[in-house]
Amino acid sequence: MRFLLKLLSKEKENILLEGFWVLEVRVTTKARENRVVCLEDGILRVRVTEVPEKGKANDAVVALLANFLSIPKSDVTLIAGEASRRKKVLLPRSIKAFLLEQFPSESSSTTGKKS
């Protein structure tokens, strides 16, 4: 498992594993409200109200993603970027379709089609 997490943390693209999807998340802390902003170039941009100390912002990101995606917090695993604005999160594979549904312009750019 440690080897897999090391491999994933070096990977720059969002990749699909059997049953899982690694999503890159860009976090803005100390925001006015917790919200998912957009999906741009395969990176999900989010804002959280928490400060980046003692894991508070990371916990807020996990809670925000779980709420936005309507999945349990236990299905959202932070695998890289604990001390960074750029994080990698392991999610169930089925979530990719949901995200592309929420951000249609991203789905056309990832499939090569123009809207």
From Swiss-Prot:
SUPFAM superfamilies listed in its UniProt record: YggU-like
Recorded superkingdom: Bacteria
GO CC field: cytoplasm
Pfam families in UniProt: DUF167
Similarity annotation: Belongs to the UPF0235 family.
NCBIfam families reported for this sequence: DUF167 family protein (TIGR00251), PRK00647.1 (NF001887)
Protein name: UPF0235 protein CT_388
Species annotation: Chlamydia trachomatis serovar D (strain ATCC VR-885 / DSM 19411 / UW-3/Cx)
